[in-house]
């Protein structure tokens, strides 16, 4: 696909009357071609107020983050994988204080482009904490328009026909982000639609690949992670792989980007691969939904085969209701066709039959019977993940390394530890009350399980000082190649051969920076230190309302603003999201 042919991410600004009926307006968006880009933005009318009391009092949200996740990134040169390690419970107020500490705060930046560059440059440095997958909603219950907990689409039949609720799929999830928290390349479970409303806080950057190019992205990912693909042909559903837009562009995969700000809504469409990151502390609410156009996607969605925890929805009720003329063919295994986004020359095949116990898919007690899989260890399920690199990475907290070593590396000779006793129980973790913490120092020690190095403060200050005069500071600690800092070399006389032989380390600015950081001698850098004890307001334990976890070119079309946001890829980098490691590791979405 030529860059001039890449579908543009559209931005819609409906009137209050247009906005009231959610399914009707989504259908209108698709009539304008919004689905071709895989992602669209909706700016709600001013009459729509999802929470009348506002967000000034975080304690009033009455939400606890039962299992925040520490996002540990490994990899280099544009392709990365990420593990999400569960941490101790936090109130939203405590999480906001944590996000404002020097270690986790958003760096100074000129604009979104500058912050994006810093994101990719620092992808492996300081694992952020994400308050992801918090079951619940902070939208007023009497808000009848675009209420994420009840959108009124055909996905409601899962609950109506089977009396099944799937957390985060047909119920709302909350996501509390901080700087650099990431959601990896993925399509939604069962290739559904999704909606994401940013209630408050810092913006969120989104990357998207048009659905018609989704197979091309998969082929590129398979080249970089061949062992993962061989192990599970739906490994991207593990939500732990992030490839930089620069790499995708080199392989002719078109990527567009857009920034979502507080008060704006993002809609993803079936088979639209998307990824992104948060600019700082914020809160988003999200869920999935379905339109009739999705049914063929759902019937032919590729499923993960290496985990019992992946979401699988029975398509029986949808085929019976909306494709009654094909229901018998489908049940007989003769519903021949192709995935809607497969190329025209793709081999025709019959849509998969519903498993015998498919209707019980969401009952946690029945998951293993509904989705039988061969037991595999974490390393077997993620063969491209370099766990040794994580152990050697000086930027990974010691408690995270210890948890991985004790809970993952010991599974080599046996089956995957599926017994509840092998890992902390997730439900039990969600019932824990956050600690009563009075200082930022206590908060940092609490989230780090008390691990600390007395020498880290000095090390952090030294590296922070470098940042002040080194604009191209690169924390991709394993990157073997660095780009020449043309700005530093601009105006200098060319080096002679003799000069280069005397000072080879100075041939590029990034190499000399590596030497200053001890890279030349192989000396690892230490994890950033805890900061000085700044007083914060005591945050009492809050009972959880949940029980689980710019320079666009605009064109107006029929009252709808269309925004062109073809990506100008960042200089280098990439990142990823995690698969599950018992109850220690989980997956994250926007």
Curated annotation (Swiss-Prot):
Residues 502-513, 537-571 have a biased composition (Low complexity). Residues 9-51 form the JmjN domain. Keywords: Chromatin regulator, Dioxygenase, Iron, Metal-binding, Nucleus, Oxidoreductase, Transcription, Transcription regulation, Zinc. Gene3D superfamilies: Cupin. 2-oxoglutarate binds at residues 130, 196, 204, 239. Belongs to the JHDM3 histone demethylase family. This is Probable lysine-specific demethylase 4B. It comes from Drosophila melanogaster. The gene is Kdm4B.
């Amino acid at each position: 696909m030529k860059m001039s042919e890449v579908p543009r991410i559209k931005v819609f600004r409906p009137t209050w009357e247009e906005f009231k009926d959610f399914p009707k307006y989504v259908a209108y968006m698709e009539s304008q071609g919004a689905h071709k880009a895989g992602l669209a933005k909706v700016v709600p009318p001013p009459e729509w107020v999802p929470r009348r009391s506002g967000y000034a009092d975080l304690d009033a949200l009455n939400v606890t983050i039962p299992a925040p996740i520490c996002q540990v990134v490994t990899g280099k040169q544009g392709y990365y994988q990420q593990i999400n390690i569960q941490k101790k419970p936090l109130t939203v107020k405590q999480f906001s204080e944590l996000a404002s500490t020097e270690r986790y705060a958003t760096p100074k930046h000129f604009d979104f482009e500058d912050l994006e560059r810093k994101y990719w440059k620092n992808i492996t440095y300081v694992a952020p904490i994400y308050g992801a997958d918090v079951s619940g909603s902070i939208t007023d219950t009497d808000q009848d328009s675009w209420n994420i907990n009840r959108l009124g689409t055909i996905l409601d039949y899962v609950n109506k026909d089977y009396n099944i609720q799937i957390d985060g799929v047909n119920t709302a999830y909350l996501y509390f982000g901080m700087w650099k928290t990431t959601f990896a390349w993925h399509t939604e479970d069962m290739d559904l639609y999704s909606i994401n409303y940013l209630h408050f806080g810092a913006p969120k950057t989104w990357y998207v690949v048009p659905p018609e190019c989704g197979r091309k992205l998969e082929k590129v990912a398979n080249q970089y992670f061949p062992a993962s693909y061989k192990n599970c042909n739906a490994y991207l559903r593990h939500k732990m792989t992030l490839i930089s837009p620069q790499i995708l562009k080199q392989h002719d995969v078109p990527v567009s980007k857009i920034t979502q700000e507080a008060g704006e809504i993002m809609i993803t469409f079936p088979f639209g691969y998307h990824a992104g990151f948060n600019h700082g502390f914020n809160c988003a609410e999200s869920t999935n939904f379905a339109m009739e156009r999705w049914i063929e996607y759902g019937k032919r969605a590729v499923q993960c085969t290496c985990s019992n925890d992946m979401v699988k929805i029975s398509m029986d009720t949808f085929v019976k209701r909306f494709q009654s003329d094909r229901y018998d063919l489908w049940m007989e295994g003769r519903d021949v066709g192709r995935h809607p986004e497969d190329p025209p020359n793709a081999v025709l095949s019959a849509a998969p039959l519903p498993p015998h116990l498919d209707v019980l898919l969401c009952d946690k007690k029945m998951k293993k019977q509904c989705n039988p899989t061969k037991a595999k260890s974490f390393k077997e399920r993620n063969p491209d993940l370099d766990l040794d690199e994580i152990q050697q990475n000086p930027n990974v907290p010691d408690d995270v390394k210890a948890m991985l070593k004790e809970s993952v590396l010991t599974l080599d000779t046996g089956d995957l530890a599926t017994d509840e006793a092998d890992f902390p129980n997730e439900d039990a973790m969600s019932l824990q009350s956050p600690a009563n913490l009075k200082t930022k120092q206590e908060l940092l020690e609490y989230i780090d399980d008390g691990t600390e190095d007395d020498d880290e403060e000095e090390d952090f200050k030294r590296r922070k000082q470098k940042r002040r005069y080194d604009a191209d500071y690169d924390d991709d600690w394993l990157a073997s190649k660095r780009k020449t800092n043309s700005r530093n070399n601009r105006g200098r006389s060319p080096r002679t051969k003799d000069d280069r032989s005397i000072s080879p380390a100075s041939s590029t600015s990034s190499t000399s920076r590596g030497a200053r950081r001890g890279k030349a001698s192989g000396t690892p850098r230490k994890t950033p230190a805890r900061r000085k004890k700044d007083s914060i307001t005591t945050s009492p334990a809050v009972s959880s309302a949940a029980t689980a976890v710019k320079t666009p070119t605009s064109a107006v079309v029929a009252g709808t603003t269309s925004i062109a946001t073809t990506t100008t890829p960042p200089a280098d980098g990439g990142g990823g999201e995690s698969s599950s490691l018992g109850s220690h590791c989980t997956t994250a979405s926007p």
